[in-house]
Swiss-Prot record:
The SOCS box contains two defined motifs including the BC box that recruits and binds Elongin BC complex, and the Cul box which interacts with the Cullin family of proteins to form a ECS (Elongin-Cullin-SOCS-box protein) E3 ubiquitin ligase complex. Switch I, switch II and the interswitch regions are characteristic of Rab GTPases and mediate the interactions with Rab downstream effectors. The switch regions undergo conformational changes upon nucleotide binding which drive interaction with specific sets of effector proteins, with most effectors only binding to GTP-bound Rab. Residues 175-228 form the SOCS box domain. Pathway: Protein modification; protein ubiquitination. This is Ras-related protein Rab-40B. It comes from Mus musculus (Mouse). Its cofactor is Mg(2+).
Length: 278
């Protein structure tokens, strides 16, 4: 719980992606198709730079993306050198109806390798809704992506197809590469059965679970879940309990066992510095 007055972040991770490609391949269309956030040219940024933020959900975590479009400017080298600082991913965009834009990807890759070597990349074929004008076969683009060792998508901003999926996959690649996925591995998503067991056990004493109007198998599962939860809680508080058989009541019962702890202070007859470890 955050302290009073401290802002609550609306995301768990913040990533910066660059969209690169020739002019008129539809990078602005991709940004405009994203729902939250508005495409903008922020004050103080050079003309030809469009910026947009959006938040995606990745394995139960909120990932905020800062998306920058260089708009294929001829002075890309200078722009990329400035805006590649801190960029964690690059989206290579071409138009499937424009062969020249696909052939130009090699030039962009050389610039990226020079100014941001090793940054994760994906290849995106834009304007899938213009498939009837296709000039770049899907198989050829897929083979090219495999040679580069990058993931390949064909997207359509008009149909809102594969837009979020492509950004989500790039975010996953970036987080895996930096090992940030380990931060949320312990917080698994609970199953519906475990949630129901927790709800029942939290409001029902353990000795009353047998009296619930439930099937025998379910009562047995709830009882074992209650015993495990109670044992873990008591062990955390420094107590130990053992399960023993009580012949008079013909049922299992808990018996408290005192835990012998090592002395926390030296004996009274032990002088300071008189005990040495050889």
């Amino acid at each position: 719980m955050s302290s009073l007055g401290s802002p609550v972040r609306a995301y768990d991770f913040l990533l910066k992606f660059l969209l690169v490609g020739d002019s008129d391949v539809g990078k602005g269309e991709i940004l405009a198709s994203l729902q939250d956030g508005a495409a903008e040219s922020p004050y103080g940024h050079p003309a030809g730079i469009d910026h947009k933020t959006t938040t995606i959900l990745l394995d139960g975590r909120r990932v905020k993306l800062q998306l920058w479009d260089t708009s294929g400017q001829g002075r890309f080298c200078t722009i990329f050198r400035s805006y590649s600082r801190g960029a964690q991913g690059v989206v290579l965009v071409y138009d499937i109806a424009n062969r020249w834009s696909f052939d130009g990807i090699n030039r962009w890759i050389k610039e990226i390798d020079e100014h941001a070597p090793g940054v994760p990349k994906i290849l995106v074929g834009n304007r899938l809704h213009l498939a009837f004008k296709r000039q770049v076969p899907t198989e050829q683009a897929q083979a090219y992506a495999e040679r580069l060792g990058v993931t390949f998508f064909e997207v359509s901003p008009l149909c809102n197809f594969n837009i979020t999926e492509s950004f989500t996959e790039l975010a996953r690649i970036v987080l895996l590469r930096h090992g940030m996925d380990r931060l949320w591995r312990p917080s698994k998503v609970l199953s519906l059965q475990e949630l129901c067991c927790r709800a029942v056990v939290s409001c029902t004493p353990g000795h009353l679970v047998d009296k619930l109007p439930l099937p025998v198998a379910l009562r047995s599962h709830l009882k074992s879940f209650s015993m495990a939860s109670g044992l873990n809680t008591r062990m955390m508080h420094g107590r130990s309990y053992s399960l023993t058989a009580n012949s008079s009541h013909k049922r299992n019962s808990f018996r408290k066992v005192r835990t012998i702890r090592p002395p926390q202070s030296p004996p009274r007859n032990c002088a300071r510095n008189s005990c040495k470890i050889s």
